[in-house]
Amino acid sequence: MLQKIQAPKSLSKVLALAFLLFCLLSPFTVKAQQLRIACIGNSITFGARLDKPDIESYPAVLAEMLKTNDYLNYEIKNLGIGGATILRFGTPNLWRLLDSLPGFVPDIVVIKAGTNETVGKPRLNWEHIDEFEKDYSDYIAEIRKVNPNCKIVICSPLDMVIQTEELSPERITDLTGRRPRIWELRKRIKKIASTENTYFLDLTSPFKGKANLMTKKDGVHPNKDGYQYLASLVYDYLVKRKIVVK
């Protein structure tokens, strides 16, 4: 009768360890899927008034925050357009970005729009504000055509800060007229989020009265510290709601 020869336990452990190392070091090891975040918005998303928007804009800072905190499998794309609206009527508007989404296919979309909708003559955006809800809902529907499982965060616009340093009298008059519209849009966007089953992030309230975070002579666009703060608000929301995971 043939006897079954068993390998020594020590040899079995060595073989198991060798197999584990092979799996870890093998070029065929499956990597974590790269998830894509599209930051869609106007000049504040783009990083207006910054010296280096490619590294100082809120999407760029957000990317660094994710990486620093071990959220390593995320790729962020800045899709900010200066002066853009989500209103179809507006020129420019965010609708032209939809053509680029099929090539990126985002898993998460953060939309920050509304600032330019408050502009009246000569652009007449506010005169078409009754179209805002329908246009926003249609925009969300178009994103879902690209990825039905996309997690969408819609943000209210940043508050305008009339106490910002060195504002001209003309600028103060302009912002004083437009600022109540920002708060009206905050309510409208929150309602859209509920209707369309998206996430809602309030960016209006956190910037209320924060003159130290706004660009001098401007009052609408953040300064470098303001963009850092904006990125932290978005980061904290994504983490708290578990929209991003490790």
Residue positions per predicted region:
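Alpha-helical cap/lid subdomain in secreted, periplasmic
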Residues: 72, 95-246
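Residue-level detector of flexible, active-site-proximal loop/helix-junction positions
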Residues: 28, 44, 83, 159, ...
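Bacterial Sec-dependent N-terminal signal peptides
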Residues: 1-34
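Local alpha-helix boundary/kink/capping signal
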Residues: 22-24, 65, 199
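Sec-dependent signal peptide cleavage junction
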Residues: 29-35, 181, 246
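Conserved SGNH/GDSL esterase-like catalytic core that processes O-acyl groups on lipids
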Residues: 34-39, 44-134, 221
